[in-house]
C-alpha cells in the first residue's frame, strides 16, 4: 500500500521546477506581469530544489549581493535605471557555473544561470527590476528555509 502511494505521486526530476519557471517567464512580455502569488510559489519550489541539489548559500548569495548592489544604486541617488546592469549579471552567472569543477554542482549552477538569465531578459525598467529583485530574494529565502548550506 505504501509503495503504491509513492508511485502515484508525480515525480519531479531535478531541474523541473526551474524549467517550468523559465517557460513561464518566457511567456511574459514583462516581468512585472508575473502574479505575486505565483512568483512566491515558484520561488518556494525553486528554493527547495536548489537546497536538495546542494547549491551552497555562498553561491546564491554572491548573485543576490550583486542584485542588491544594483538595487541600492538605482534607489539611493534617484539614478536612472540602466537595464544593461541587469543583463551584465548573465556573464556573472555563467562564470559561476563554468568555474565549478563538480559536475553535479555545475549542473545546478547552469540551471540557476538559465533561470535568472531568462528573468534578466524581461527587465526593461525599474518596475520590472523590482519584480526581479523580489524573485531573487524569495528564491534565496526559500533556499535557506529548506536548509541550504555552505557544504
Which residues does each PLM region occupy?
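Intrinsically disordered, low-complexity arginine-rich tails of RNA-binding/processing proteins
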Residues: 1-23
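The feature represents the first ordered module of a protein
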Residues: 15, 19-109
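Amphipathic alpha-helical binding modules
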Residues: 110-148
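Charged, terminal alpha-helix-loop-beta segments
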Residues: 151
Amino acid at each position: 500500500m505504501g509503495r503504491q502511494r509513492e508511485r502515484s505521486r508525480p515525480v519531479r526530476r531535478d531541474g523541473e521546477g526551474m524549467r517550468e519557471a523559465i517557460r513561464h517567464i518566457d511567456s511574459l512580455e514583462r516581468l512585472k506581469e508575473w502574479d505575486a502569488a505565483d512568483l512566491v510559489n515558484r520561488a518556494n519550489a525553486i528554493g527547495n530544489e536548489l537546497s536538495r541539489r546542494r547549491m551552497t548559500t555562498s553561491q546564491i548569495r554572491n548573485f543576490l549581493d550583486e542584485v542588491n548592489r544594483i538595487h541600492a544604486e538605482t534607489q539611493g541617488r534617484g539614478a536612472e535605471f540602466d537595464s544593461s546592469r541587469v543583463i551584465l549579471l548573465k556573464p556573472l552567472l555563467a562564470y559561476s557555473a563554468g568555474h565549478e569543477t563538480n559536475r553535479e554542482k555545475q549542473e545546478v549552477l547552469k540551471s540557476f544561470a538559465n533561470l535568472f538569465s531568462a528573468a534578466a531578459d524581461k527587465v526593461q525598467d525599474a518596475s520590472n527590476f523590482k519584480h526581479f529583485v523580489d524573485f531573487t530574494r524569495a528564491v534565496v529565502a526559500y533556499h535557506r528555509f529548506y536548509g541550504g548550506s555552505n557544504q
